[in-house]
Amino acid sequence: MSATTDTTPKPKGGWWALSPLAVFLCLYLVTSLLVNDFYKVPITVAFLASSCYAIAITRGLNLEQRIYQFSVGASNKNIMLMVWIFILAGAFAQSAKQMGAIDATVNLTLHILPDNLLLAGIFIAACFISLSIGTSVGTIVALTPVAVGLAEKTGIDLPYMVAIVVGGSFFGDNLSFISDTTIASTKTQDCVMRDKFRVNFMIVVPAALIILGIYIFQGLSVSAPPQVQTIEWIKVIPYLIVLGTAVAGVNVMLVLLLGILSTGIIGIYTGTAFFDWFGAMGTGITGMGELIIITLLAGGMLETIRYNGGIDFIISRLTRHVSGKRGAEFSIAALVGIANLCTANNTIAIITTGPIAKDIALRFHLDRRKTASILDTFSCLVQGIIPYGAQMLIASGLAGISPISIIGNLYYPFCMGTCAILAILLRYPRKYSGEG
């Protein structure tokens, strides 16, 4: 007989319900920091150990039911969607590299952008694309292979280059009208998108301008190769198709499928053998294997935390001793941030904590437009700096580097978070903050 169980969280867990997350962080982050090597402990092993621990501490279920509950999280529709995107992204990235699309796009970028504006140009491109398409994942999928190619050609540190793309991608993820997080935050707080946009704009644009200035300054020392190779315009077409369809708002999976087809058609036209194209796609998909395993293990572990009452425990603790508008806003920020830490999905974190945030806002007379902005901004902050988030995993997978090496080079999410904290402390923007 197959194991079945109610997925509604029943156990009323305390800190023990959150302990699998602590086990993972200790195994991966703390151990890696102690030995000063983030490749010493594979992230898959850290997740496997913490997942086994999460299953072991689950109460009220036999072993078969615990494994079933874990599998419910691993096979969640959001997790599965991420897996399909990873598969298509791997196939596109490798086939684009094999037929020369990445080299052609890199050469075009080096030709168009002055050396000293290369870093700033990549950041602006990531901000613009993410603002246009409303998704950080789509932006990272489109730009990371180009960032890798630019790093190889210019000698710029690879994790630093990829971090520019990841950081810029969260600008639009947080601000775009069509972002899932914008929709979730405005719907849960019953406010109009354009009003939330105004508040968000005032908070995060200063952060983006500060980081842009840093990249312009740091770019002064960048020098491109003395002779950029001739641009093969026809090989740039796959990337133009990917960027064009992404900006037009086409579903990211269809964007990647069109990109894969275009690399095949143009590759064969320019001399790539048909089966070499197939081989490149296979190599790309296989290369995403570790990333997919991490995603499944993380999904299962985080679902177990939810089932054991970890998120409910956080909510009850953070809302217990709230006083004053500042305290109320900080409690909402902490609420959505920790929920995001436990779900690794900023949209789900907002949906989970949105109703509680609305109650807090009503109780302390907070402006719902700023409440929506706080939910969106702090969920994006946490999503941007966790090593097991979809954005960090896909960026590290495409670049072949550790997620922690990217996090160590991130500027924008931390600056955005600092500006958001200052906005709460200084009651900014005044129009939407009231008295503290």
Locations of regions flagged by a protein language model:
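Hydrophobic transmembrane alpha-helices of multi-pass small-molecule transporters
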Residues: 1-87, 199-294, 433-436
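Juxtamembrane and boundary regions of transmembrane helices in multi-pass small-molecule transporters
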Residues: 2, 167-170, 174-229, 234, ...
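Core transmembrane alpha-helical segments of multi-pass membrane transporters/permeases
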Residues: 44, 48, 56, 67-100, ...
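Juxtamembrane helix-boundary/capping and inter-helix hinge elements in multi-pass membrane proteins
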Residues: 61-63, 75-79, 155-159, 184-196, ...
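Membrane-interfacial loop-to-helix junctions in multi-pass transporters
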Residues: 76-82, 107-125, 151-161, 205, ...
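Hydrophobic alpha-helical transmembrane segments of multi-pass integral membrane proteins
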Residues: 83-92, 114-146, 318-358, 375
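Alpha-helical transmembrane segments of multi-pass membrane proteins
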Residues: 85, 116-129, 155-172, 327-340, ...
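Re-entrant/interfacial helical elements at transmembrane boundaries that shape
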Residues: 138-150, 166, 177-190, 346-360, ...
